[in-house]
């Protein structure tokens, strides 16, 4: 099994697309990249811990390749916005691909270069690619949020879905 970590705005909106793929064993919401061990949602939202909201994905590389996960990641984000994603603003919502191996780093960097060269976006691709840091599991009520709160999920992801439809379909 392998592990992937992606930050692309609110973690509520990042889980479902990955959970729907064959070969995904788990998708967990949490926090990474900061300086405070085991931060709470409130601490991360206060923007004082340095963490980003992210999803940790455990996958079977025999069933789904990391490259495919990176491609799916791009299609969930606005890779030209370094200051958050959609209605979620600030460093805690910035887009980051966290790599857990040097091979993941190579794949992510090549994928980013390919996306930039594709001309899909007029602006530069600013998503960062950084080494994975400790991943702290978010509170239970954040896990599988889209399943537990479908109406609230739909409301909170409307702007994201419009962008994705216009730019990735």
From Swiss-Prot:
| Broad class of enzyme this protein falls into | oxidoreductase
Location of the active site: 10
User: Could you tell me what reaction this enzyme catalyses?
Assistant: L-methionyl-[protein] + [thioredoxin]-disulfide + H2O = L-methionyl-(S)-S-oxide-[protein] + [thioredoxin]-dithiol; [thioredoxin]-disulfide + L-methionine + H2O = L-methionine (S)-S-oxide + [thioredoxin]-dithiol
Gene3D superfamilies, alphabetically? Peptide methionine sulphoxide reductase MsrA (3.30.1060.10)
Q: Does the keyword Oxidoreductase apply?
A: yes
What EC identifiers does the entry list? 1.8.4.11
Annotated GO biological process: protein modification process
Q: Per the database entry, which stretches of residues form a coiled coil?
A: none
**Keywords of this protein's UniProt record, alphabetized?**
Oxidoreductase
> What GO molecular function terms would the record report?
L-methionine:thioredoxin-disulfide S-oxidoreductase activity; peptide-methionine (S)-S-oxide reductase activity
Entry function: Has an important function as a repair enzyme for proteins that have been inactivated by oxidation. Catalyzes the reversible oxidation-reduction of methionine sulfoxide in proteins to methionine.
| Family the UniProt entry places it in | Belongs to the MsrA Met sulfoxide reductase family.
Please identify the protein, giving its name as recorded: Peptide methionine sulfoxide reductase MsrA
Look up and give the organism this protein is from: Streptococcus pyogenes serotype M12 (strain MGAS9429)
């Amino acid at each position: 099994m392998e592990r992937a970590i992606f930050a692309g705005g609110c973690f509520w909106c990042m889980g479902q697309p990955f959970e729907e793929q064959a070969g995904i064993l788990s998708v967990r919401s949490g926090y990474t990249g900061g300086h405070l061990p085991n931060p709470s949602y409130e601490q991360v939202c206060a923007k004082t811990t340095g963490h980003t909201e992210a999803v940790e994905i455990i996958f079977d590389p025999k069933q789904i390749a990391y490259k495919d996960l990176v491609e799916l990641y791009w299609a969930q984000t606005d890779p030209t916005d370094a200051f958050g994603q959609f209605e979620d603003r600030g460093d805690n919502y910035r887009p980051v691909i966290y790599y857990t191996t040097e091979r993941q780093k190579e794949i992510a960097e090549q994928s980013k270069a390919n996306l930039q060269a594709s001309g899909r976006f007029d602006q530069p691709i600013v998503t960062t690619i950084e080494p994975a840091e400790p991943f702290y599991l978010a509170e239970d009520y954040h896990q599988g949020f889209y399943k537990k709160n479908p109406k609230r999920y739909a409301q909170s992801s409307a702007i994201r879905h419009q962008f994705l439809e216009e730019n990735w379909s």
